């Protein structure tokens, strides 16, 4: 019996069909998804709204909601004109995502703060946001394509975010993100929490940069040429991680690097790595 890799098992049934079997409506779905991905990579990390860190979570939430709603409406229109929701029978990825949603529904139903679970009590990470995450994951798995431009756009976003963060570390307040004339150095004294860059608090910034570094370094080394410039935002990200005092990032960073290991292996060794990471 032929072996199937873990990656193929998880994505079976949600990857785009081959080009020759795609209808015009499905190609429009692919085009919309391409623009959706670019929009998220370019705008979401950098958008800060109009009230600085005081309202940053809400600004990013409504941006994500608006962009996702426009994309979903476009996809729905394409589905009404001939595009198929699945290229073939739904695979494990689809059912795992549905299980994720069911888990969130059960959690919300059993929560003693049930009335606050829909949006997330000011943090905007509630049930509605989890639904958007699932919609994004399934849509990109179905109509997304692997493109180098995505890494380049993400690298540009990381560069700009880190440039703002470095300015703040040096004592500045670009974009007026800190209120009342405060600075990054005032964290823990004049205000609670730590905020840096255009992402928000340093914990979230650390998670984003921890994911970015291995992706940017891998792409730069593999593609070479002008893509070696991606090493610049990667280096900036490492320095910002160090100065942000986000200790959890130094746990997340090795984990993110481990996720890149299957890209460096082939054949049986790659299957072993995928199995180990899945376990």
Regions of interest found by a model, annotated:
Residues 86-94, 145-155:
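Membrane-interfacial loop-to-helix junctions in multi-pass inner-membrane proteins
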Residues 21-37, 92:
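N-terminal membrane topogenic signal
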Residues 117-127:
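Non-cytosolic membrane-interface motifs at loop->transmembrane helix junctions
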Residues 32-40, 45-47, 67-75, 101, ...:
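Alpha-helical transmembrane segments of multi-pass inner-membrane proteins
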Residues 47-53, 107-116:
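Juxtamembrane "helix-exit" motif on the non-cytosolic side of transmembrane helices
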Residues 55-105:
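Hydrophobic alpha-helical transmembrane segments in multi-pass integral membrane proteins
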């Amino acid at each position: 019996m032929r072996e199937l890799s873990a990656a193929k098992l998880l994505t079976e049934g949600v990857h785009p069909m081959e080009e020759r079997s795609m209808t015009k409506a499905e190609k429009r779905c692919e085009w919309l998804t391409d623009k959706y991905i670019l929009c998220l990579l370019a705008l979401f990390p950098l958008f800060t709204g109009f009230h600085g860190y005081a309202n940053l979570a809400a600004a990013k939430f409504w941006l994500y909601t608006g962009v996702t709603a426009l994309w979903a409406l476009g996809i729905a229109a394409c589905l009404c004109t001939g595009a198929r929701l699945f290229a073939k029978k739904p695979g494990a990825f689809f059912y795992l995502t549905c299980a994720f949603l069911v888990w969130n529904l059960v959690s919300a139903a059993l929560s003693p703060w049930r009335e606050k679970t829909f949006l997330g009590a000011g943090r905007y990470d509630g049930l509605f946001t989890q639904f958007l995450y699932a919609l994004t994951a399934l849509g990109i798995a179905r109509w997304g394509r692997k493109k180098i431009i995505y890494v380049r756009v993400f690298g540009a976003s990381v560069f700009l975010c880190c440039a703002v963060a470095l300015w703040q570390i040096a004592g500045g307040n670009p974009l007026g993100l800190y209120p009342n004339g405060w600075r990054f150095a005032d964290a823990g004294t004049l205000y609670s929490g730590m905020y840096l860059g255009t992402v928000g608090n340093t914990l979230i910034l650390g998670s984003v940069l921890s994911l970015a570094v291995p992706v940017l370094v891998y792409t730069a080394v593999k593609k070479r040429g002008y893509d070696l410039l991606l090493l610049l935002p990667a280096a900036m990200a490492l320095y910002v991680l160090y100065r942000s005092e986000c200790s959890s990032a130094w746990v997340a960073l090795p984990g993110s690097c481990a996720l890149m290991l299957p890209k460096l292996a082939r054949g049986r060794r790659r299957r072993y790595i995928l199995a180990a990471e899945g376990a």
